[in-house]
């Protein structure tokens, strides 16, 4: 029970630290104009790897590119986040798209397309 509580607490700390690094420190051109939200972090029981689930806005066709950019930047993100979350071994980060906002994404994408059509 205590271990489970510890993992939940570390998940929350990692989520906050990773989100701050992505927002402030990552300067990758494919994600600089996107709104990336870290929706959850799932740490392995041995604390050596973490699944980081992200949601990417504003539109559908940038999600895969943003995910690839995050995967390329994973080492940098882990290094920067490790300064805020002190662990004996900082976990290896693995990024995944989270479909938690998929209905909202669909509506957002439709609104984006309407806006683009009105501009042209």
UniProtKB/Swiss-Prot annotation:
Annotated signal sequence range: none
Keyword Cytoplasm in record: yes
Location of the protein in the cell: Cytoplasm
Molecular function in Gene Ontology: ribosomal small subunit binding
Domain of life of the organism encoding this protein: Bacteria
Pfam family, one: RBFA
Keyword annotations of the record: Cytoplasm, Ribosome biogenesis
GO cellular component, one term: cytosol
Family, as annotated: Belongs to the RbfA family.
Protein name: Ribosome-binding factor A
Species whose genome carries this gene: Chlamydia pneumoniae (Chlamydophila pneumoniae)
Gene transcribed to yield this protein: rbfA
């Amino acid at each position: 029970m205590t271990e489970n509580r510890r993992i939940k607490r570390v998940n929350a700390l990692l989520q906050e630290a990773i989100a701050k690094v992505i927002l402030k420190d990552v300067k990758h051109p494919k994600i600089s104009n996107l709104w990336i939200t870290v929706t959850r972090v799932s740490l392995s029981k041995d604390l050596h790897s973490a699944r980081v689930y992200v949601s990417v806005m504003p539109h559908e066709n940038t999600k895969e590119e943003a995910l690839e950019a995050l995967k390329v930047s994973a080492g940098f993100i882990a290094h920067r986040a490790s300064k805020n979350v002190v662990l004996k071994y900082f976990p290896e980060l693995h990024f995944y798209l989270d479909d938690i906002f998929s209905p909202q994404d669909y509506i957002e994408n439709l609104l984006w397309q309407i806006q683009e059509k009105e501009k042209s």
